[in-house]
């Protein structure tokens, strides 16, 4: 039996999908632009703080 592929980590989540990492690449900026144009409430993933 193989283990599940999704092993949640807040650090990895932010580093790969966070705002600053998106803005570092042209394609990431395109993602932000698309989501702004579409009127998304959340542009990138946010980690809820307890």
UniProtKB/Swiss-Prot annotation:
Belongs to the bacterial ribosomal protein bL34 family. The keyword Oxidoreductase does not apply. The keyword Ribosomal protein applies. Keywords: Ribonucleoprotein, Ribosomal protein. GO terms for cellular component: ribonucleoprotein complex; ribosome. InterPro entries: Ribosomal_bL34, Ribosomal_bL34_CS. The gene is rpmH. GO terms for molecular function: structural constituent of ribosome. It comes from Syntrophotalea carbinolica (strain DSM 2380 / NBRC 103641 / GraBd1) (Pelobacter carbinolicus). It comes from the Bacteria. One of its GO terms (biological process) is translation. Signal peptide: none annotated. This is Large ribosomal subunit protein bL34. It holds the Pfam family Ribosomal_L34. Residues 10-20 have a biased composition (Basic residues). Transmembrane segments: none annotated. Residues 1-32 are annotated as: Disordered.
